[in-house]
Amino acid sequence: ETGEDIRKRGQEFGATTGRPRRCGWIDIVALKRAVAINGISGLCITKLDILDGMPSLKMCIAYKYHGKQSEYAPLDAQGWDQCEPVYLEFPGWNESTAGITEWEKLPPAARAYLRALEELSGCPLAIVSTGPDRDATIILQDPFA
């Protein structure tokens, strides 16, 4: 249900096939692994504006596997079937973030959510996009400098 709402808000459908993309809350466990394996030095968060007006937001911070909480992903496909996400919940915001180009102008709850994402992933934010226009971007760390 949440994934479908996010998909509709963000118009997440294949450009060629029109097939719906899988959407859901950010998986910090997977993100931390991607950061470690790939040497990622900065995150680019896109479509922040589609979260406007949501009463609350979640981040998966661990998995529950056979009753035990783990911050590591299972190594096999069967393990995934037996995992439950453990979520950290954040308050949403009602203010629009669409088109904002300065960090300080984001709603406080949006900044708190993004800072938590940064802290939990262990990777700094580089860019936050706040809409479909190229100019609807907050550059925190220029990845091309």
Each model region followed by its residue ranges:
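Non-transmembrane, aqueous-exposed alpha-helical and coiled segments at domain scale
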Residues: 1-145
